[in-house]
Amino acid sequence: GWWPNKLVALLNVIQQIGWAAVGCITGGIALSAVASHHLSPRVGVVIIAAISFCFSLLGLRVILVYERYAWIVFFVIFMILFGEAAPYVDNKTPTSLEGSALPGAVLTLLAIVYGSSASWCTIASDYYVEYPANENRIKVFLLTTLGLAVPTSIGMTAGAVAASTLNNQPAWKDAYDEGIGDALLNIFRPSGFSHFLVVMLMLSAVNVNIMNTYSAGLSIQQMAKPLSAVPRFIWTFLCFAITIGLGVGGSSDLNQYLQSFLSLLGYWCTSYFIIILEEHAFIRRGKFTNYNLDAWNDPNKLPHGIAAAVAFGLGVVAWVMGMSEDWYVGPLADLF
């Protein structure tokens, strides 16, 4: 509907800016480590944000070309990480968590992984609009599924492998206490090569942020017609400024920022996806010919969206009942 979609656009802006801040924090911490901490992580956050902002101004086609090939570099780096860390993996030391703390930690990780992947559903159309209208749907589905599952699995597995080595490598653990960048510098060898790899890995933050800032600008324009009349680069600059503020504020505690933000994404993204899926399956009967594409920006031809708004509201009730965050624990979650 016309009006509920404004809320979705606002939530998407918050989500994309939050993701951009995550990228800036991780990239800034890594950049500080490469500079032997002569550079503040906060300055690193600003540098990453500025590079991302400049790239996002180049337009969608340039972004797509960059994204098409950038993954190769990061894939190679992750494979090197596996090779360097694998000899020191510790899969024998029992966990120190007891009782409900262990399943709670597992569920938190699953929520973070799910939330990071599910957030793609709210921006996919920003990029899939470039596909021909007659593109094979199975091909798009498979590419999307693999494009989410494979990188997420590699990243999560690499993190688990690297974390498990800390029991066997006290020096790496001490470095990790200083920051993720210091840990990577110790894992990668030799020293000069490790600096190069961490700098390249830092660019993965730029890789993510380019899409975040671009999509955030689009979502701002969708919130109201007067906003769509403002050039997109102005909204992109505004997102850039907010990202710097969040990144600088969250750079002191990356893990807490990640858990507090990323675990929230799965809540509203799931509600959004389910509503869209139900409309397509039951109201549109699974046929794209039942959509009036010419009415996408005409409130007189679009439904009011009351049913979708109510469904979304019921979803919010479910979130509040079951969520367990540092700042709030719902009544259902409090039972466990």
Map each language-model feature to its residues.
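Membrane-interface loop-to-helix entry segments
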Residues: 43, 47-48, 52-85, 98-100, ...
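Hydrophobic, small-residue-rich membrane helices and short re-entrant helix-turn-helix hairpins
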Residues: 58-71, 119-154, 167-182, 213-233, ...
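Transmembrane alpha-helical segments of multi-pass small-molecule transport proteins
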Residues: 9, 35-58, 72-83, 116-124, ...
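C-terminal membrane-solvent junction of multi-pass transporters and transport-like membrane proteins
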Residues: 272-336
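Loop-to-transmembrane helix boundary motifs in multi-pass membrane proteins
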Residues: 42-47, 222-256, 297-319
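Hydrophobic, membrane-embedded alpha-helices of multi-pass small-molecule transporters
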Residues: 82-88, 98-164, 189-213, 301-319
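Membrane-water interface regions at transmembrane-helix termini and the short interhelical loops
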Residues: 7, 26-36, 49-70, 85-88, ...
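Transmembrane helix-loop boundary segments of multi-pass membrane transporters
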Residues: 33-44, 61-70, 185, 189, ...
